[in-house]
From Swiss-Prot:
GO cellular component: 2-(3-amino-3-carboxypropyl)histidine synthase complex; cytoplasm
Protein name per its UniProtKB record: 2-(3-amino-3-carboxypropyl)histidine synthase subunit 1
Cofactor(s) required for function per UniProt: [4Fe-4S] cluster
Entry's localization field: Cytoplasm
Physiological role: Catalyzes the first step of diphthamide biosynthesis, a post-translational modification of histidine which occurs in elongation factor 2. DPH1 and DPH2 transfer a 3-amino-3-carboxypropyl (ACP) group from S-adenosyl-L-methionine (SAM) to a histidine residue, the reaction is assisted by a reduction system comprising DPH3 and a NADH-dependent reductase, predominantly CBR1.
Lineage: Eukaryota, Fungi, Dikarya, Ascomycota, Pezizomycotina
Species whose genome carries this gene: Aspergillus fumigatus (strain ATCC MYA-4609 / CBS 101355 / FGSC A1100 / Af293) (Neosartorya fumigata)
UniProt similarity note: Belongs to the DPH1/DPH2 family. DPH1 subfamily.
Annotated PANTHER family: 2-(3-AMINO-3-CARBOXYPROPYL)HISTIDINE SYNTHASE SUBUNIT 1, DIPHTHAMIDE BIOSYNTHESIS PROTEIN
Length: 445
């Protein structure tokens, strides 16, 4: 449920501008071992043999210049034609066109796959035209399959289509670039917003001294971090929580940090829609949640039917306990399905002598599963929110991997194991979305 709150006309406010260069990650200092230092010392002709003693101070050779491989050169950054082409795109959306052009040129990619979420497909053809114009000899391919989130990165299809590089827009690096099957470039698409209105609205609705936990999608992550010092100067205490390995402040629809209700007064979500916020609300049922929509510039109080959701999921788990035959669905939409999680559940079923069937699906619909009526329980390794949000619409129980392990007696129920809080940690470091091969052996005979 959404309850709008008082807005503000956003009076003029002095806000310090933060240089974009301050947000750039600085290169880590390289550790120089003793063996390397000795080698440099021997090559330095300016150091005489008299000075090379255990107690003498030796002059260290100057560090080499930093690597420039990933730095966009001025001839691309300052190219007036490229800048003119970028003007065709919204000014407050950072599609990082110069960075993409540089990556295509330096990698020598000849066929580039572009993957967008539904909301950004409107800009796909424009970006495609810009890249092909400034990267002669390069062909672009727009991937049209639905992209729900960071888990849907489709490097397998891009590789099958003969692409050399995949550019994935508007999601974080949930699947690391050293794991993807082809070279991958993540573009977060930072979105700039008018923060003065947000600050004025918060000041009008909340008393100074409140502790606010700020979260959002990756597009607004830079804004969240920029807001922290401004809100603190206004008298608020600001916490930007993290659930590793996600970035600080970033949440997904299936993964969000669990906060202490005694330390946090307000959970503030920056973004449009409720899908991601609901993850944080499920994981923090006692903390009041608010959503600021930067497009409509409204602040609303958000609520969630925790009791109803818990009752539906308990009923599905209890029904699954008596199922004679199970079905295991491995999601094939991008990287949604984890084969190791599937193997782990298979091992537990085999250990208990429960027959099962495996099914590979890109999208899961009730009608598809209803045609296999002999299967009395399904567990889907794709998106936990599909079961949580839509499980009631399926003719048989549709469990998440976590719920399946509860039904099989492998894990404790959230009522006893997590103080009644349903966990939202699917892509956390030890979450079931990241099951490793050795963990898949659990339950094996």
């Amino acid at each position: 449920m959404t309850e709008p709150l008082l807005s503000s006309a956003a009076p003029e406010m002095k806000m310090e501008e933060t240089s974009s260069s301050s947000n750039l990650r600085q290169p880590k200092k390289r550790f120089v071992g003793r063996r390397t230092a000795d080698a440099h010392a021997q090559k330095d002709a300016s150091i005489s043999s008299k000075d090379v003693e255990s107690t003498s101070v030796q002059r260290v050779a100057p560090r080499r210049n930093p690597r420039t491989l990933n730095q966009v050169p001025p001839e691309i950054l300052d190219d007036p034609e490229i800048q003119a082409a970028i003007e065709l795109l919204p000014k407050n959306y950072s599609f990082e066109i110069p960075k993409t052009i540089h990556r295509i040129r330096t990698s020598g990619a000849k066929r580039v796959a572009l993957q967008f979420p539904e909301g950004l497909l409107i800009f796909a053809t424009t970006i495609s035209d810009i890249l092909t114009q400034f990267c002669p000899g390069t062909e672009t391919l727009i991937m049209g399959d639905v992209t729900y989130g960071a888990c849907c990165i489709d490097d397998y299809t891009a590789r099958a289509l003969g692409c050399d590089l995949l550019v994935h827009y508007a999601h974080s690096c949930l699947i690391p670039v050293d794991v993807t099957q082809i070279k991958t470039l993540y573009i977060f698409v930072d979105i700039s917003i008018d923060t003065s209105h947000l600050i004025a609205t918060l000041e009008r609705n909340f008393q100074p001294g409140k502790t606010i936990a700020t979260v959002g999608t990756i597009q607004f992550n830079a804004t969240l971090h920029g807001l922290k010092p401004v809100l603190e100067r206004a008298g608020f205490k600001v916490v930007i929580p993290q659930i590793a390995p996600l970035s600080k402040g970033e949440i997904l629809g299936c993964t969000s940090p669990q906060l202490s209700p005694t330390e946090i007064d307000i959970l503030l979500y920056l973004g449009d829609g409720r899908f991601h916020l609901e993850s944080a609300m499920i994981h923090n049922p006692t903390i009041p949640a608010y959503r600021y929509d930067p497009y409509s510039r409204t602040l609303s109080r958000e609520t969630y039917s925790h009791d109803e959701m818990h009752a539906l999921r308990r009923d599905a788990i209890n029904t699954a306990k008596s199922a004679k035959k199970w079905g295991i669905i491995l999601g094939s939409l991008g990287r949604q399905g984890n084969p190791n999680t599937m193997a782990m559940i298979e091992n537990h079923l085999n250990e208990r002598g429960i027959p099962f069937v495996n099914l590979l699906l890109s999208e899961i619909f009730p009608g598809k599963l209803a045609s296999m009526s002999d299967v009395e329980c399904w567990v889907q390794i794709a998106c936990p929110r599909l079961s949580i949000d839509w499980g009631y619409a399926f003719p048989r129980p549709l469990l998440t991997p976590y719920e399946a392990l509860i039904a099989l007696g492998v894990r404790e129920h959230w009522d006893s194991a997590n103080s009644g809080v349903y966990p939202m940690d699917f892509y956390a470091k030890e979450g079931l979305g990241r099951t490793k091969p050795q963990q898949a052996l659990q339950g094996a005979a």
